[in-house]
Amino acid sequence: MFLKKLELKGFKSFAKPITINFESPITAIVGPNGSGKSNIVDAIRWVLGEQSAKTLRGSRMADVIFAGSKDYKALNKASVTLYLDNQDKILPLDVSTVKISRKVNMDGQSDYYLNGKICRLKDIENLLMDTGLGKDTYSIVGQGKIDSIINSRPEKLRELFEEAAGISKYKSRKMDAEKRLEKTNHDLQRIEDLIWELEKQVGPLEKAAQKAKKYRRLKEELKVLEVNLLLDKWDKNLDRLSSFEEDEQLLIHKLKSLTNNLTESQEKLESLQRTLKVKKDELSRLRDRYYRQKSKREEAENTLCILEERRQGLSREKENLNQEIKDLNLRREELTGRLDEIGSRLIELKEKIDNYNQNYESKKVLLDEIKENLDREKQDLFFLRNNILDGNVELKDISSQFEQLKERGRHLEEEIKRIKTTRDKISSEYDALNEREDKLRTYLKSVDNKIEEKRSVLTDLKEEELNLQARLEEAKKRFNRTRNKLNEKNSHLSILHEMEDSLEGYYRGVKNILKARSKLTGIIGVVADQIEVDKKYELAIETALGGRLQNIIVKDDKSARECVDYLKETKGGQATFLPVNMVNGRKVNFKNNQVKKVDGFLGIASSFVDCEDYLKPVIEYLLGRTIISTDLKSAIEIARLRKRGFKIVTLEGDVINSGGAITGGSKNSNKKMLLSRSRKIEDLKKEVLKLQNSLGEDSKNLNQLENKLKEVLNKKEVIKNDIRDLEIEKNNYHKDLIRLEQEKTKLSERLEEIDEEFVDCHDRLGKNDAAKQKLEDKLKALNDDFSLEKNEIENKEKRVEELEARHENINDEITRLKINLAQLNEKRESLRKEEEKSNKELIELAEKNEEFKERYNKILSEIKGINNKEGQLNELKVKLSGEIEKLKNDLNLTEKEVEEKQQRIDMLQREVSDLQTRLDKKKDEKHQIELKITRLENRNERIVEILENDYDVKPEDGFDDRIKITNYSRAGQKVKELKNAIKKLGTVNQGAIEEYNDLVDRLDYLQNQHDDLLKAKESITKVIQEIEETMSSLFHEAFLKVNGEFNNTFKELFNGGQASLKLTEPENLLETGVEIVAQPPGKQLKKLSLMSGGERALTAIALVFAFLKVNPSPFYILDEIDAPLDDANVTRFARYIKEYSRFAQFLIVTHRKNMMAEAETIYGVTMEESGVSKLISLKLSEQII
């Protein structure tokens, strides 16, 4: 496997896309500092998954996107693609070329791609694991990486050995196993807590279960006795009901005769009322017409007022138009005057322009004459200068010798200056070293302060860690409490759902009908399922309905017959059916409003029930004669006021039956309430949802606390690392101080050498000046001979200068004339535009004047029309007044006729009232019989309610434990004895039996889970031990191999010496660090921190190549690691790379010629434009592309 190609788009300083082909074993990247060479190395590191922006020399990940320059806009994304040749299938992919890509947007979010398909960073890391490649492996050695490897802590250096040993995947597996072990321990602790809590509940719950069994036995015996007593009463009441119903039929016949007479009188009354209605309608029409005509007259009067206001408005507008016309005429006069003024100014400007043009032409002629004289003088000057040049031949030799001496003196002076400059520079360097020494000592003090600050922060983090751990423990407890509550509510909800699905609490006959409803037709459902009741009235309605909650509502009597036949055929028990087409509601009729005024009266029971409209008659039938009150006191007061056949139920479930019997007391809380069951299910669902939300919040809080704790732990580790880094920085400052002292000594010796050079140069300069003086005297005598000719030349030159000055002055005057002409022309153009604008405005004013005159004429015409309309409206007003007077007379006549008809109707109404009184008397007699019937029915209903609600028995179905009671007194005494025995038991948890059984099952289940978790813990612990043994073995094997190769490589690079690796904790191979000890040729064995920079760099290189031999990487990237080496070591290192390029591919960023010489392909990076890198390539056999 080797690197084939690298593509960059918008990455760092590369604004344009570039492609680098790696066709040679050794590829070099060269270029000046700051040109962007290292950005190519950063691109490879980045595409392999680097997550630290700081490592990529940025503050955030979006900094890798090209930020723009003077000529290039900033980009909004960057991408890098790396092509790997995989023909030898080192990577576990069935392709010959593997393409790894990474893209980033301005938000800093990265996407990874493998062969063009999006993937995770972990997928790429897993692919490259143990191949020697990756963002943190030794295959990429960046700027300063050599020193960082050597100066790494022993624990950090160990990571390179782990990569070489191939134990990264084992380390990852171990971490996963430890997480699973931690989770298992956590689950184990939670299970043990639950078992401990449940075991505490077993003893008390077992006693409660035994007590509940005894309670059930006594309760069953009491039920048999009470049911038989109630059934005997129910049979006797049925016999009395039959007698009362016969008396009721006789009264019904008499009521029918009175009703017919009343109907006849009512028909006569209705006929008269219809006649009266016709007359009243006629009266209403007359009144409507009367008021309409009055309204028209008022409307005509209003219109007259409006017309008057309009006429006044038009008059005002006419006056305003007159004023506008006057203003327009004034403006026209102003504009005419301005136009005359503009004409005068235009004439003046024309005269000025003509004068300037004449002056311009005369100046131009003068300029041409001066130019001609100037050319003639320059030609004479040229001939004089040539004559002097011809006479200078004799002076050339002397001048040449003089110049040589002069040049030599200049060189000596420059040498003296250079020596002075060098001395000043060295003195400055010496002062800078002193200053740098002071800064280093200041830095040392600053580092010490930072270390103390970091240690203080570390102490605060430890306290925060303890606080978070305590809060986390409390959050876990709260989470467990909420989860337990949720489990309890879910269990209760499940029980209610099971009861609902199994029809628990319904009579046998009702159950069989509901189960067979798919076979039968017309079944709507039981009463309990078809109504909705507010929780406040739930107990009252359940008490009022009793067993009738299980009555089955059907569409019609045919459906009822079908259901009864089905029960008979299947012997499925009995049920009561309510056909919608036959059931008629009965409702209490309050003629006496005193009942409503009773404090505590709430209303008729049926009004507190919601149902479908078509079922309301059924609800009226069931509850229309039942009143609901707040308590028993108000119920008794209502019963006293209204002694008729109705039932009163309180909100507490107490009942006053129609006969006056009062039923009340405590309710059986364990009784199966059919009406409230659905509501309880909905309430429980809401509670479960609330608990689930609360559990989610607790879980979220728990996760937040765990994340905060992890964050604090991470911060602690960062602070610890910072302290270690600061200690290293402090040590480096100490080393720099030692180096500074050495450099200062060298500079002092150099200053002494420079002072000796300075004295020698001064002596040589004195001799040179003496020789130069002799030649200078000789030159002076020759120069006197040419002085006359020079004077003549100077005169000519002055004449030329005067003419040139005069030429320039006249030229300036011409330029000023041009400017003045341009300004005058501009003013003339401005006046012409103003003249044009004023003429245009005059035209517009004329048009406006015409418009105002036209509007004035229209106003005069409109005023005339208003005067005509006023005359018409006055005529209409007189006509309407006559019609109104006639309508008033017709109204009076019709009102008299209506009054007569009303008197006849009053007489008939008295007759009808008398018949109604007699009818009501007979109805009262019938009502008394109905009351007696109702009382007996209510007594039987109460008996049925008690049987159905308290004992789940229907009289129609019979009773399996029916007995004949001969001694009612003895039976009553037995009931009291049984009730006392039940009372002595006290509070009984009737669900204790089921709860005890559930608790035992739950404990068994948790114990099995506990055993499974113990086995899992043992298994995971064993896996971790096996992984650790494998890691120790692989690490030890890799360490021995690298140690041997490191010593060999060190000897090859240093031409001798020795080096070795040592373990800081040999007995702990899983965590031991690694230290490096080296001995260059001719020196003692010592630690790397005491070696020179070049020795440390070469030692680091030896270590890298030792790793290469033990676990070769397919390619290596070296970023200026040869910088600290001298030429000899660079040559040796370059040959070494050349040798190993047979086994691996190298990409080298370098400045060194010796290293470039070994490369077959060289890429140059330049920055011709600021901030934009450009790539060029060259091969040994090719020109630069």
Swiss-Prot record:
CDD domains the record matches: ABC_SMC_barmotin
Subcellular location: Cytoplasm
Keyword Cytoplasm: yes
Coiled-coil positions: 167-494, 677-1031
GO cellular component: chromosome; cytoplasm
Entry keyword Phosphoprotein: no
SUPFAM superfamilies associated with the record: P-loop containing nucleoside triphosphate hydrolases, Smc hinge domain
Pfam families: SMC_hinge (PF06470), SMC_N (PF02463)
Keywords: ATP-binding, Coiled coil, Cytoplasm, DNA-binding, Nucleotide-binding
Main location: cytoplasm
Highest taxon, organism lineage: Bacteria
Protein's GO biological process: chromosome condensation; chromosome segregation; DNA replication; sister chromatid cohesion
Residues reported in the UniProt entry to bind ATP: 32-39
SMC hinge domain ranges (all copies): 521-639
GO molecular function: ATP binding; ATP hydrolysis activity; DNA binding
Description of its domains: Contains large globular domains required for ATP hydrolysis at each terminus and a third globular domain forming a flexible SMC hinge near the middle of the molecule. These domains are separated by coiled-coil structures.
Function: Required for chromosome condensation and partitioning.
Family from the record: Belongs to the SMC family.
Subunit architecture: Homodimer.
Protein name as it appears in the record: Chromosome partition protein Smc
Native source species: Halothermothrix orenii (strain H 168 / OCM 544 / DSM 9562)
